[in-house]
Amino acid sequence: MAEHGAHITTASVVDDQPSIFEVVAQDSLMTAVRPALQHVVKVLAESNPAHYGFFWRWFDEIFTLLDFLLQQHYLSRTSASFSEHFYGLKRIVAGSSQQPQRPASAGLPKEHLWKSTMFLVLLPYLKVKLEKLASSLREEDEYSIHPPSSHWKRFYRAFLAAYPFVNMAWEGWFLTQQLRYILGKAEHHSPLLKLAGVRLGRLTAQDIQAIEHRLSEASVMQDPVRSVGEKIKLALKKAVGGIALSLSTGLSVGVFFLQFLDWWYSSENQETIKSLTALPTPPPPVHLDYNSDSPLLPKMKTVCPLCRKTRVNDTVLATSGYVFCYRCVFNYVRSHQACPITGYPTEVQHLIKLYSPEN
């Protein structure tokens, strides 16, 4: 039985084809980096909204731009994405087995480079936006934010009904491809690699030497520049390369930090964490920073600060502790991403509905 399993796991279509463990590990690397950076930006934005609130509001776009620079840098210099290069892999143009292989240091051909960039950067961005849209529409539908006569109601309800099945089909497509890869029936573990016209292979010793040689040459050589246009082009190229190199260095260090966090929060360390965090709840502050003269704060505790009417569907903001009508605060937070009273960065997920005994 073990012999049969070993045969299956080593049944590669190509000799330099990486194992399923390597390709899954490199796939999960960038997947782990995004939420980690998002959490860091969230903490900074909550601690100083004036300086870091912009980065929280536009996190997806900023991350996509930096990811684009990073992936372009690696694809054009190592024929691999950042995570693939981190695990010693490279992208090989499909159908080039009969021809001399292009060295990894030469980068991918332009057509395959842009296809790879689109699937590595643009597609994840669109997927994140689609998931946020589905989550937002689901919450609006659950609490009937839209009026019954809304023309969009039928459309977004159809979208909400179809989205889980489309997502399931998408994930099933990837799972099927991975199973075929494990059984040696496919040379791509991901359908996106096939669409990009490339496959993954391991870096050879010659590839590693050539990449290191090219990096050392780039730092030493300075080509004579003739025109102002060439100077600007070279300066932009160096700036982009410097940003990408800084990102790659920071991410390389961050990867080890993420692995440490993964170990820290593993099941083996749960008892240690509980013993450290099982501290008594501190008493409430004697004096709260409460400005009774604020025009937004009503005199009666049952009045919503936004609509100035008796609250309906009491909802508290976890970021500030103030209570509003659900409809009022939902629309405000969705538009401004902040608490109406304190201005603290706030998302729809911070809304907590209250159910009093009187209701």
From Swiss-Prot:
Compartments where located: Peroxisome membrane
Pfam short name (any one): Pex2_Pex12
Gene Ontology cellular component annotations, sorted alphabetically: peroxisomal importomer complex; peroxisomal membrane
Family matches, as CDD domains: mRING_PEX12 (cd16451)
Molecular-function GO terms, alphabetical: ubiquitin-protein transferase activity; zinc ion binding
Membrane-spanning parts: 20-47, 52-76, 110-139, 145-183, 250-277
Gene3D superfamilies the UniProt entry points to: Zinc/RING finger domain, C3HC4 (zinc finger) (3.30.40.10)
Top-level taxon of the source organism: Eukaryota
Cytoplasmic compartment segments: 48-51, 140-144, 278-359
Assembly information from the UniProt record: Component of the PEX2-PEX10-PEX12 retrotranslocation channel, composed of PEX2, PEX10 and PEX12. Interacts with PEX19 via its cytoplasmic domain.
Similarity comment text for this entry: Belongs to the pex2/pex10/pex12 family.
Stated name of the protein: Peroxisome assembly protein 12
Organism: Cricetulus longicaudatus (Long-tailed dwarf hamster)
Species lineage: Eukaryota, Metazoa, Chordata, Craniata, Vertebrata
